[in-house]
């Protein structure tokens, strides 16, 4: 029997996105990145110089570079290694300073990365929120109604070892880049269909039109100005209100923000004056932008508040904020050995806000494969963040959150455990005392859905769980949940009820009959 294959689906013909202006070019050759696996000749030379033959060989055998390719650029290398960086004309970009251990920990491979590869290939189940249409599948993320994220670039000018987009770099899960025309047409088509349906989706649920675009990757700012302009033009043609660009270039290579890039932004603004541009920076540690003396201390400004910034970093922020149609916000994860100190987080927030960059989020590191080498326990991170916010005004503060499958979950509080004082213990019935201490004895953690996917019915919903000081992600609390907004309304207290029943039955073990009885009562 002869099998006849179906003809491939043809792509719909799209209106080609035309660029009708001359986009200026940036010259970034002097700060070009170096990327590669350990067999790349320049990478292997650097690894041998830093680690020596024995440790480098151990990392090769452990497959550290297979987990993630190494990437660095001259600016960030100078900071990590304590080197001076100059332009071809002799201008000092990075002065000679002590090597920055936090920056080295952020960018340099670690042997322990592959010691435990537990974690998710697609953290937070992002592919669940891509478009179902084959044409757009894996090219965008539409998790929240009013904003669409498009993968504009597949790479960065350096590689954070804790990156949660490993699957995009390694092509593991189906994520891939989107063309400007596709991004534009998806938004226009979605909004048109929504309007035709009276603001409701195919299931009759209330939905909101797309008003914002987030260009992500990788890092969109590694693209040439012309390519980046095409994405910004696509956003303008899609009639969105706010164009957001997520980028670590201001930390990795602030020289990227040159006159040509600023002129490119102005060209976009001239065509779409009502479209605001919001660049979300990824500053992770103050060493990325502050000058340090020979003793590794930050240098105070002589005639004003705060500390001295490195010249390229200062110029980059100032030139962007001189544009009245643009704003800067910052978000970054908390990473072990990088920025997991109160001082680092406090100075990061204070200095960014002083310069006009609004702190937005400090994230719990995502549960990527190998995350145990980078993640700080959730409750430890909350404590560091909480103490770091002391002495900062409300405009200088960020939220400590984890970006989960169920949205951005803010860690609202960690409450210490409760034990009855000796003088009260005898006044409370034993059964009640046991139940209360079973629930509250270890303490509790409160999470809040600051951003919930799609419609906002579950916005600000709570998850309340018994503490787990070792937990690195919300998954570490799933068997300890007392109240859960993610469940159906009549099931949200099931964890609490189950625990009360087990306590009342006098069983703390794993007796299957007791567990089933408790779950039946909870249901």
List PLM regions with ranges.
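Flexible, acidic/Gly-rich N-terminal and inter-domain linker regions that tether
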Residues: 2-142
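Conserved, mostly hydrophobic/aromatic
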Residues: 76, 160, 360
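Conserved alpha-helical substructure of the radical SAM core
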Residues: 144, 166-213, 230
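Intrinsically disordered, low-complexity coil segments
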Residues: 53-56, 81-101, 114-137, 189-209, ...
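Conserved AdoMet/S-adenosylmethionine-binding subsite of the radical SAM
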Residues: 191-203, 208-210, 218-392
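Canonical Radical SAM [4Fe-4S] cluster-binding loop centered on the CxxxCxxC motif
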Residues: 142-179, 245
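C-terminal accessory regions of radical SAM enzymes
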Residues: 385-523
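Catalytic micro-motifs at enzyme active sites that drive phosphoryl/nucleotidyl and oxygen chemistry
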Residues: 136-139, 149-151, 185-186
């Amino acid at each position: 029997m002869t099998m006849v294959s179906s003809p491939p689906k043809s792509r719909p013909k799209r209106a080609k996105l035309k660029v009708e202006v001359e986009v200026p070019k940036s010259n970034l050759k002097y700060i070009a990145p170096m990327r590669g696996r350990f067999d790349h000749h320049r990478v292997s030379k650097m690894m041998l110089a830093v680690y020596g033959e024995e440790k480098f060989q151990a990392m090769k055998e452990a497959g550290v570079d297979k987990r993630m390719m190494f990437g660095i650029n001259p600016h960030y290398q100078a900071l990590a290694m304590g080197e001076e960086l100059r332009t071809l004309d002799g201008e000092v970009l990075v002065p000679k300073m002590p090597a920055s251990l936090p920056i080295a920990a952020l960018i340099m491979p670690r042997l322990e990365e592959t010691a435990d590869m537990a974690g998710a290939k697609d953290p937070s189940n992002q592919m669940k929120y891509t478009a179902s249409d084959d044409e757009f599948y894996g090219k965008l993320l539409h998790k929240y109604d009013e904003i669409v994220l498009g993968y504009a670039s597949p790479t960065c000018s350096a590689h954070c070892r804790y990156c949660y987009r490993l699957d995009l770099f390694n092509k593991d899960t189906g994520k891939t880049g989107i063309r400007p025309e596709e991004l534009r047409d998806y938004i226009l088509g979605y909004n048109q269909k929504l309007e035709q349906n009276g603001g409701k989706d195919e299931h009759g649920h209330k939905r909101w039109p797309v008003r914002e675009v987030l260009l992500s990757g990788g890092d969109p700012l590694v693209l040439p100005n012309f390519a980046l302009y095409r994405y910004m033009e696509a956003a303008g043609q899609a009639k969105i209100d706010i164009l957001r660009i997520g980028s670590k270039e201001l930390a990795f290579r602030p020289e990227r923000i040159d006159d040509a890039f600023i002129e490119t932004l102005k060209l976009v603004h001239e065509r779409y004056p009502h479209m605001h541009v919001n660049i979300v920076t990824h500053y992770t540690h103050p060493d990325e932008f502050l000058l340090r003396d020979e003793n590794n201390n930050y240098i105070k400004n002589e005639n004003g508040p705060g500390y001295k910034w490195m010249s390229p970093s200062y110029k980059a922020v100032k030139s962007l904020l001189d544009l009245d149609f643009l704003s800067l916000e910052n978000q970054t994860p908390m990473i072990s050995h990088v920025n997991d100190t109160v001082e680092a987080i406090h100075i990061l927030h204070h200095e960014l806000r002083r310069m006009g960059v609004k702190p937005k989020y400090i994230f719990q590191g995502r549960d990527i494969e190998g995350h145990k080498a980078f993640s700080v326990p959730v409750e430890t991170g909350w404590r560091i963040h909480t103490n770091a916010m002391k002495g900062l005004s409300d405009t200088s503060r960020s939220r400590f959150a984890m970006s989960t499958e169920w949205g951005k979950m803010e860690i609202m509080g960690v409450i210490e455990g409760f034990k009855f004082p000796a003088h009260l213990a005898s006044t409370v019935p034993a059964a009640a005392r046991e139940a209360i201490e079973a629930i509250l004895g270890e303490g509790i953690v409160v999470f809040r859905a600051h951003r919930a996917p799609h419609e906002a019915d579950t916005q600000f919903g709570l998850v309340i769980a018994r503490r787990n000081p070792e937990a690195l992600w919300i998954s570490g609390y799933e068997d300890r949940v007392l109240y859960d907004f993610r469940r159906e309304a009549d099931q949200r207290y099931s964890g609490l009820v189950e625990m009360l029943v087990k306590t009342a039955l006098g069983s703390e073990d794993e007796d299957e009959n007791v567990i089933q009885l408790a779950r039946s009562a909870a249901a």
